[in-house]
Amino acid sequence: MQANSRAYFLLIALVSFGLVGVALYLQFEKGYQPCPLCVMQRFAFIGIGIFSLLAAVAQNTRSLWQGLGMLSGIAGIAVAVYHVSLLLNPKASCGIDPLENWVNALPTAKALPQVFYADGLCTAPLPPVLGLSVPAWSLIWLFILTLTLAVGLIRREKNFR
């Protein structure tokens, strides 16, 4: 069971980090400039990945790391829902996003600007990827990963009863 649990969390981390890799590919190879909401969704995927790695190696505190991974996912889902709603209603945005200054002032934007610096507009029309916008794909994957962590936590709790 322990080997299965470790593989379970490692797979979640791999998918999370892989999706950040897809975002970087779209940024550097396809020219999709990340907006502040995109960067915040990257933080959510990275949070899920890091907490899943910690859950894989720390059996005694696994539920804690799993819960924190779920919180990262829930925060990312909230951001992605808002982002998708902005794309569906572009007139709701004023064009200048005050969130950009805040995101770009974070230490991560200064340490790794290639990954965490936001210079795109949240309502910029970008070509769809496999028929959906990037924020829609982000929402789908954040939901899947968060649900996967939640199901694992529920199963774990049932096994201890």
Curated annotation (Swiss-Prot):
Residues 26-43, 82-136 are periplasmic. Its main location: membrane. It is found in: Cell inner membrane. The chain crosses the membrane at residues 9-25, 44-58, 64-81, 137-155. Signal peptide: none annotated. One of its GO terms (biological process) is protein folding. Gene3D superfamilies: DsbB-like. It is a multi-pass membrane protein. Residues 1-8, 59-63, 156-161 are cytoplasmic. Keywords: Cell inner membrane, Cell membrane, Chaperone, Disulfide bond, Electron transport, Membrane, Oxidoreductase, Redox-active center, Transmembrane, Transmembrane helix, Transport. InterPro entries: DiS_bond_form_DsbB/BdbC (IPR003752), Disulphide_bond_form_DsbB (IPR022920), DsbB (IPR050183), DsbB-like_sf (IPR023380). Required for disulfide bond formation in some periplasmic proteins. Acts by oxidizing the DsbA protein. PANTHER family: DISULFIDE BOND FORMATION PROTEIN B. This is Disulfide bond formation protein B. The gene is dsbB.
